[in-house]
Amino acid sequence: MICVEIWSNRPDFCKMLEPLHPLLRQAFDPERFLRLGQQVLQDAFQHLQDSQEKKRERSMPWTAPEEERRFWEERLSAPEGLVPLLNLVSERSNRLQDPRYMGHQVAVPFPDGALVGLITDLLNNGGAVYEMGPTNSAMEDVLMARIGQMLGLPAGCGGILCHGGTLANLVALLAARRSAGKEGVDVWSDGDDGLGAVLVSEQAHYCVDRAVRIMGWGTEGVGLVETDDRHRMTRAGMEKAMLAMEKKGRRVTAVVGSSCTTSSGAFDNLEWVADFAAQHGLWFHVDGAHGAPAAFSERHKHLLSGMERADSVAMDFHKIMGIPALCTGLFFRGQEMSFLPFTQSAEYLWSDAEDPEWWNFGKRTFECTKRMLSTRVAAVLEEYGPEIWGVLVDRLFGLGQALAELIVQRSKAGWQLAMEPEGNIVCFRYLPGDFTDTEAENAFTSNLRQKHLEQGPQYIVQTRFNGKVWLRCTLMNPLTEAEDMAALLDRLEVLAQEVQR
């Protein structure tokens, strides 16, 4: 009664509601959307064609950070509209579709992915609870179980899709921490003593170290395992690191195998890691962000022998699986294990916070709202089947071996290969003439890479390990050919002469 009296004295908001603003009408006009879409798609086609045919001067249009910021400071002060903006972004961005782009570990996406993004961005369904995105929630659960078995995990496996391998590795280690909790103690609810630890290769991606620190275990919570001359963890190194952690009073909960390392592309012997984990009662996690797709290749799946014994596996669909960033799968050998990392009350979202409802992904993910990632994965399987991942891996890994062969053929001229590549990451350097010491070699290599960055036309990066600076190629584009890689070496030889002057 009181509520009725209050509302009876309020203004008539329905009559006061203003007509739809012209800007909003314009923004939501379907016919305008169609016109813009046709133009944008035509421009995207031209960008794709020009990139594949190497029509632009450089695959990476380098500008210094401050120069690029000044450009956008001015440009964004004078808006010209959506189509001109998108064309300018395309013009000034890295051309991953150009076969001369051989830099970072980011997929050259199947062009179909842009069409998938068009629809999923328009639908914009979330995924914290089933009601926000029923289609992508159901597809995600089906796909994670099926693909997990393709990776060799047992029936009953499952997992989640998330935005990036860094997040996937963190969530996996949160599961490991909770799994290793003492009887009657729930670390999610009560915290822990801060004395946990994780063993990981000294060559592993820094995100594992970061995850351990986020969990509150600090620098001492990371047990770095020594590697051999091919950057693979050794059995003796794992035992040594375990003993060192125990002497510090640390409680090791997990060991992480790298498949493969970011800097050099080394694959840990996962059979050794699995044996070690079983011997010591540890959670066995595989950081397969880059290399786990080798499971789809008959030619290269031996690199992952032992992964089928893992408790959890992280795999980026946005690296060598042709899917736009970000899209990562975190697989658990048992679907029930995917509920370990998070349990908390959120009654307004689901009826029972402790009930393992697979359809409410907010119970299993760090993220609440996330993009419709499952549609990206499903689209590839619908159009090509999982076979395309196998042939893509074979092609990219084959390019890595071909580049290594080209480098070895020029070894007498000063070319050095860091190690024979197992995948599509190749580290090398060019040292013409005599250098006084390692410092001089490193300076020359860095200067050569900087000059190449500025002048192109290819794009590569550099890395450092064992005190030496190396040039580094990640062959991500299946359209790259042997002549493109030979042209890269030729170009570096020309630029080296300028550096030596």
Predicted regions mapped to residue ranges:
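Active-site C-terminal subdomain of aminotransferase-like
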Residues: 261, 305-408
